Design a protein with these regions (language model features):
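PRPP-associated nucleotide enzymes
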Residues: 1-153
């Protein structure tokens, strides 16, 4: 779908998720593009907002193309085409380490004075501003399932 901008997309998404209004959902944004969207959705649904930190693993020679992703715990998702894109074990190990360091720095930046909100037993809605390969969403959902939300949307 095409939207005028991220805020317009967030407003339409909040409308589609209206059944969760007043149920204190936890809206988790995949930074950076989804953060303003999650703020709008959290306000409309009367929920809390936080971030879920994941990073794409970039293809060799093509940093915009995801060959996989990593979550904050270090769990790695690799697309079945990663090797065909030129990513060998050493490249994946180094790229994973680099992205985990970025995640560590972003955790300090996004939640410097408090721990992340705990999704356990809560309705959790994950927001991203696009799903080109779906890699970062796969990692985000994997990370969140391990934390036992009541519902994961």
């Amino acid at each position: 779908m095409i939207f005028a901008d991220r805020i317009a997309a967030a407003e339409q998404l909040a409308e589609a998720l209206a059944e969760y209004r007043g149920r204190q959902p936890l809206i988790l944004a995949i930074p950076r593009g989804a953060v303003p969207m999650a703020q709008v959705i959290a306000a409309r649904l009367e929920g809390e907002m936080d971030v879920v930190l994941v990073r794409k693993l970039r293809a060799p020679g093509n940093p915009e193309f995801a060959i996989g992703s990593v979550d904050e715990s270090g769990w790695v998702y690799l697309a079945d085409y990663a090797a065909a894109a030129g990513a060998d074990e050493a490249y994946i190990r180094d790229e994973t380490a680099a992205q985990l360091e970025t995640i560590r720095q972003r955790r300090i930046q996004y939640t410097p004075v408090r721990p992340p909100h705990d999704p356990a037993g809560r309705i959790v809605i994950v927001i991203d501003d696009g799903l080109a390969t779906g890699s970062t969403m796969i990692a985000a959902l994997h990370a969140l399932r391990a934390k036992k939300p009541a519902e994961l949307i």
